[in-house]
Amino acid sequence: MASGTFDIIHPGHGFYLSESKKLGGDNAILMVVVATDKTVKNHKRVPIVGEKQRCEMVSMLKGVDEAYVGDEKDPFKIVKEKKPDIITIGPDQNFNPDSLHKSLLKKGLDIKVVKINDYKKFELDSSCKIIRKIKQTDFDMDYLENCQ
């Protein structure tokens, strides 16, 4: 099981999800929990893309078998329901794997937690870098006004 914001999809997301699925072996089912809009706003910034659309986009990515919007009241709800063998933490996520594992054990869930550290660097390897690049780009306003 992987989780994240997935606001503006970029190659780093694909790498994270691909590495997450590999950990499960040949017949792995990759489940992804997409952060709610409120969670994103509280921990990062206001999301550009809404949670339902982000979840649908993630569900379309290669290797993803199931995608869910997280639960605002209980962040462990989907984990308790689906009981994955492994939970992966992305390279940009500030969770301590040992702390998360201990929290899971307290809830009666003995789930392996793995931090995905290897991260292929791309010029635009984060949503923030993409947003910054868009802000710096001199767009033809006529084109943007006619965008549908």
Curated annotation (Swiss-Prot):
It catalyses: FMN + ATP + H(+) = FAD + diphosphate. Its cofactor is a divalent metal cation. ATP binds at T5, F6, H10, P11, G12, H13, D92, Y119. Keywords: ATP-binding, FAD, Flavoprotein, FMN, Nucleotide-binding, Nucleotidyltransferase, Transferase. Its EC number is 2.7.7.2. One of its GO terms (biological process) is FAD biosynthetic process. Pathway: Cofactor biosynthesis; FAD biosynthesis; FAD from FMN: step 1/1. HAMAP family: FAD_synth_arch. Catalyzes the transfer of the AMP portion of ATP to flavin mononucleotide (FMN) to produce flavin adenine dinucleotide (FAD) coenzyme. Belongs to the archaeal FAD synthase family. This is FAD synthase. The lineage of its organism: Archaea, Methanobacteriati, Methanobacteriota, Methanomada group, Methanobacteria.
